[in-house]
């Protein structure tokens, strides 16, 4: 089956997943830099050269890469661009100040991100600001730090449960260390408050019932309203995090709910859009900022940049509010002055610390964003539509799969009545259970995890299959079940627009991924034994 790959400039000497010590000095320095300046999630195994997500810092061109909802390996084209860029930086640093070079270049990243999103302003205009971060989870921590004890009121953050967002989000959103090591390489006490006495708390809301079906918008809104009422009565401020989109491609809570709650509770309620999947158009992001919602983005999901890189966008109103806010001294272990906007008081707590790993990861992500935005929207819509229709039809007709319930991505409250079709209304993450073909029901969460892990193993005759890691979505009886996800990324869409057969090749490749997944599921269910740990009620 033909694979969609970028045949432009690429470094043939880079071995997929090879440990850095096997490569020549220049490449080794680049690969070490790409996985530096973050927490332990970036660490690569010395033997395999891969991190906990099964990805390394060098291109893996054979992979069937449909797992961008979790993580991606840098593309050959982005790697080539970053390699050239890094070589220039190293040459410049032979005679120049690395701190000054970093401050200039990370400032350019901020400028380029805002430019690509259509957020450039002239000097006399109020400006949108961007805080850069080493991951999306860090952004939740930064937002909690900025809002903690504003007007001397404790903060309560409200997020979706971690199965739809991220494993560390709830801890970060409560102002606590969410990993054991931070980007400065300092060890920290996971779960400990960044600033003692902030007393930030986090509440979570489920968007699915126990059987995996979706709760109604009304049910979710009533629960949220109750939580915010209790917070107000206790003298707390609230930050509501709206996820657009979640791990299983949900916009939740709904925008109608968010806007109604904002109208009801006013200034005591702030809203942040968790758009860390970055499956949004520039126009949608601008519309959110026009509502004075904060917007969290990352470069490592839809954009398929190397893990991890993040940004928190703040509208002019929010920027003015945050400009004078102090942050905990402990935040200096997470970021340096240059990652924060000039003129912000938060910079006073931070040091001049360069994070060239973050710089390179954002450079790769923006390379992919620029290529994606260069594709006419009608072509993007055509690719997304064809992919979604083909994959959905296969999942509905194949006895090996069960589609996970989802709902349309409704952003009509941003636009009003409009007949214009936007590319980000078409799902690029499609979630499904694996059925037990040797009995009844679906595979257990443990069996699904086994399928996922075995698919990712590269063999002599078979490329590794990269799909979105299992998401715990349901309990059938007392047995947990998880859904897998097949996803499009910006590089896949770009590649699908590059030739007469490219789109059909993309869909054929997706069908191969589903073939391989069904085969592995059948093997795992057979090995687990007939009737053992099966979910007969699914």
Give the role of each language-model region:
Residues 7-52, 59, 69-138, 146-153, ...:
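Conserved N-terminal alpha-helix of the aminotransferase class I/II PLP-enzyme fold
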Residues 131-136, 140-349, 355:
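Conserved PLP-enzyme active-site core in the AAT-like
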Residues 1, 473-538:
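PLP-dependent enzyme catalytic core of the Aspartate aminotransferase-like
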Residues 102-120, 463-474, 490-492, 498:
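Disordered regulatory segments flanking catalytic cores
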Residues 300-423, 517:
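Active-site C-terminal subdomain of aminotransferase-like
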Residues 33-81, 98, 217-227, 457-477, ...:
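Extracellular distal adhesion/interaction modules in secreted or cell-surface proteins
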Residues 369-483:
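Conserved small-domain helix->loop->beta segment predominantly found in fold-type I
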Residues 78-89, 103-110, 217-227, 252-264, ...:
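Well-ordered, non-membrane alpha-helical segments in soluble/globular domains
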């Amino acid at each position: 089956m033909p694979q969609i790959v970028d045949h432009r400039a690429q470094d043939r000497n880079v071995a997929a997943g090879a440990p850095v010590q096997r490569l020549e000095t220049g490449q080794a320095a680049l690969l070490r830099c790409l996985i530096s300046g973050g927490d332990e999630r970036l660490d690569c195994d010395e033997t395999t050269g891969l991190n906990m997500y099964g990805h390394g810092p060098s291109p893996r061109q054979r992979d069937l890469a449909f797992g961008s909802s979790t993580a991606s390996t840098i593309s050959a084209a982005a790697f080539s661009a970053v390699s050239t860029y890094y070589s220039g930086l190293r040459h410049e640093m032979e005679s120049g100040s690395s701190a000054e070079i970093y401050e200039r270049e990370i400032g350019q990243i901020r400028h380029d991100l805002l430019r690509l999103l259509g957020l450039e302003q002239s000097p006399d205009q109020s400006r949108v600001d961007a805080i850069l971060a080493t991951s999306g989870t860090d952004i939740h921590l930064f937002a909690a730090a900025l809002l903690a004890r504003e007007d001397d009121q404790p903060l309560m953050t409200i997020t979706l449960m971690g199965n739809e967002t991220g494993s560390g989000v709830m801890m970060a959103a409560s102002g606590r260390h969410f990993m054991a090591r931070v980007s400065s390489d300092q060890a920290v006490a996971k779960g400990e408050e960044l600033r003692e006495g902030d007393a930030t708390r986090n509440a979570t809301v489920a968007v699915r019932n126990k059987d995996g079906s979706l709760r109604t918008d009304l049910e979710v809104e009533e629960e949220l309203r109750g939580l915010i009422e209790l917070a107000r009565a206790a003298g707390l401020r609230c930050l509501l995090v709206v996820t657009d989109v979640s791990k299983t491609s949900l916009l939740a809570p709904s925008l109608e709910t968010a806007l109604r709650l904002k109208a009801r509770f006013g200034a005591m309620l702030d809203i942040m859009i968790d758009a860390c999947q970055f499956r949004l158009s520039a126009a949608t992001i601008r519309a959110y900022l026009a509502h004075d919602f904060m917007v969290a983005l990352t470069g490592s999901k839809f954009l398929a940049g190397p893990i991890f890189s993040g940004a928190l966008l703040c509208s002019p109103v929010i920027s003015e509010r945050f400009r004078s806010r102090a942050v905990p001294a402990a935040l200096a272990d997470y970021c340096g002055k240059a990652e924060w906007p000039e003129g912000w008081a938060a910079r006073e707590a931070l040091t001049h610390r360069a994070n060239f790993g973050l710089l390179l990861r954002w450079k790769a992500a923006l390379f992919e964003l620029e290529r994606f935005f260069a594709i006419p929207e009608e072509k993007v819509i055509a690719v997304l539509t064809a992919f979604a229709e083909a994959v959905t039809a296969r999942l509905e007709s194949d006895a090996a799969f069960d589609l996970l319930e989802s709902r349309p991505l409704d952003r009509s409250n941003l636009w009003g009545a409009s007949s214009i079709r936007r590319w980000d209304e078409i799902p690029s993450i499609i979630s499904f259970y694996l059925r037990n073909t040797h009995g009844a029901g679906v595979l257990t969460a443990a069996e699904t995890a086994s399928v996922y892990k075995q698919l990712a193993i590269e063999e002599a005759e078979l490329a590794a299959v990269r799909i979105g890691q299992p998401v715990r979505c349901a309990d059938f009886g007392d047995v947990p079940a998880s859904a897998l996800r097949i996803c499009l990324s910006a590089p896949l869409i770009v590649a699908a627009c590059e030739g007469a057969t490219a789109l059909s090749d993309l869909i054929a490749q997706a069908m191969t991924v589903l073939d391989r997944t069904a085969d592995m599921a059948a093997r795992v269910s057979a090995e687990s034994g007939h009737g053992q740990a099966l979910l007969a009620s699914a």
